[in-house]
Every structure is written in C-alpha cells, then in structure tokens.
Regions:
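Conserved structural motif at the start of ABC-family nucleotide-binding domains
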Residues: 2, 17-19, 72
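Hydrophobic anchor residue at the start of the ABC signature
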Residues: 143
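A short, proline-enriched helix->beta-strand linker immediately N-terminal to the Walker B motif
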Residues: 148-152
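Helix-to-loop junction immediately C-terminal to a conserved catalytic motif
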Residues: 48
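Catalytic Walker B motif of ABC-type/P-loop ATPase nucleotide-binding domains
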Residues: 154-158
Length: 183
C-alpha cells in the first residue's frame, strides 16, 4: 500500500504537488489524468524518491521511501527513457535488470514470453543498442523491464506515449492480466 501524507513540492512559486492524504491499496490500478505541468510526473518522482519533498512523506508498505530502500525490491518503475541504459542491447538490458533482482537468464527468457506480441519482432534479436531504437520501442523496453521481476508495485508514467494503437491495446490487456495474476 502507498500512503501519501501532507506531501508538497514547489518549484519556485509554482506548487507542483500538494496532497493532504491519499492511500493506494494493494491491487488498485490508478491512472493520473491532468494537463501538462499538472504535477503527475513530479508525484511519481516523489513516490520513487527521485525528488525530495518540501514537506510530507510517502510510505510504501509502511516503509518511508526517503529513509529506507527496502521498498525498491518489490517496486518496478518506468518514467522515461532516461531509465534505460542505452549502450546495451535490449537483451543485455533485460538480463541486467533480471540479475539485479536475482533472476537467472532462463528465468528472464521465460518472463519475456508474455511480451512477445507486444514486442512484435521489433525489439529482441535486432543486434542494435537501445539508443538506436524508435521512441515507441524504447517505451516497450522500459515497460517490460519494469515488469520483469513481477513487482508488487508498478509505476509507469505515460505508458502509452509513443506506442501505436495496436501496442497500446496489447499493453492495456497485459497490465490488466498482470494485476489479476499478481494481486
């Protein structure tokens, strides 16, 4: 469960985030909708402890994200392609992420199987670095890498950005199935 308590973040005079109290429970799927600059990405960065709050805190399963890093073991996230290591191939990157979570190569290969249709023969086996992929395929790599270790908490910022309509439909189905299977 995520608990947000009196969370505030300002950039100069602009208040980007101001949340008195909010809870997100195990199994909830939540989408944030708002105008550009409304603070959605800032909120995600605060939840993931990538930004320091001016006031308040975020806890994940009763762990204050700014004081302890244990929550990272059961959290997957993709905010933008800055999360990717662009001098690796997708395969190398997936194996690297898997290794961070104690997964063997065979386990990573098995966990990639449900994403074959999503990758549509455009990601694996291309023998090129991530930096040379289209924005849509980088988005796919990021989403898959966030889900690879079957996290309890999955945070995806604008997951449909750069994806064609077919890929958007596939990932919506995969996210729904993931939530049903893992919560």
């Amino acid at each position: 469960m995520i608990e947000i308590n009196q969370l505030q973040k300002n950039f100069g005079e602009k208040k980007a985030v101001d949340i008195e109290k909010y809870s997100i429970y195990q199994g909830d799927m939540l989408g944030l909708v708002g105008n550009n600059g409304a603070g959605k990405t800032t909120l995600f960065r605060l939840i993931l402890d990538l930004l320091q709050a001016d006031l308040g805190n975020v806890t994940i399963n009763d762990i204050d994200v700014s004081k302890n890093e244990d929550w990272k073991q059961f959290t997957g996230a993709f905010i933008d392609d800055g999360f990717l290591i662009d001098y690796l191939t997708p395969e190398e990157y997936f194996y690297f992420i898997g290794k961070m979570y104690g997964l063997k190569k065979e386990e990573v290969d098995e966990r990639l199987l449900p994403f074959e249709r999503f990758m549509s023969n455009e990601v694996l086996g291309q023998k090129k670095f991530i930096r040379n992929f289209s924005a849509g395929n980088k988005q796919k790599i990021g989403i898959i890498s966030a889900m690879l270790h079957h996290p309890q908490l999955l945070i995806l910022d604008e997951p449909f950005n750069f994806l064609d309509p077919s890929s958007q439909s596939i990932i919506k189905h995969l996210l729904k199935k993931y939530n049903e299977d893992h919560h």
